[in-house]
């Protein structure tokens, strides 16, 4: 009877394991990058992931660069 209870508890806890694909986000070679179907407006495309999706990096706080071209009057 002990063996039956042991097997029951083992099979019960094994059935509770969630699939890894749904819980973990695939990360591209960049530390802050993420694999998506399409990059958001606030992200840039920097390469491809292992599943051939684009690797997207957030832009963050980029300094605004003023144009050095002289203005025509």
Swiss-Prot record:
Keyword check for Secreted: yes
A Gene Ontology biological process in which this protein takes part is: defense response to bacterium
Provide the leader sequence positions. Answer: 1-22
Q: Which UniProt keywords apply?
A: Antibiotic, Antimicrobial, Defensin, Disulfide bond, Secreted, Signal
Q: Which InterPro entries match?
A: Beta_defensin_dom
One Pfam family from the record: Defensin_beta_2
GO cellular-component term (any): extracellular region
* Family per record: Belongs to the beta-defensin family.
The protein's name is Putative beta-defensin 108A
Q: Which organism is it from?
A: Homo sapiens (Human)
């Amino acid at each position: 009877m002990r063996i039956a209870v042991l097997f029951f508890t083992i099979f019960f806890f094994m059935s509770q394991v969630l699939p890894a694909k749904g819980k973990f986000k695939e990360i591209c070679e960049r530390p802050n990058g993420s694999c998506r179907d399409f990059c958001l407006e606030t992200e840039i495309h920097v390469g491809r992931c292992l599943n051939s999706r684009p690797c997207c990096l957030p832009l963050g706080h980029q300094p605004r660069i003023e144009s050095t071209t002289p203005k025509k009057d």
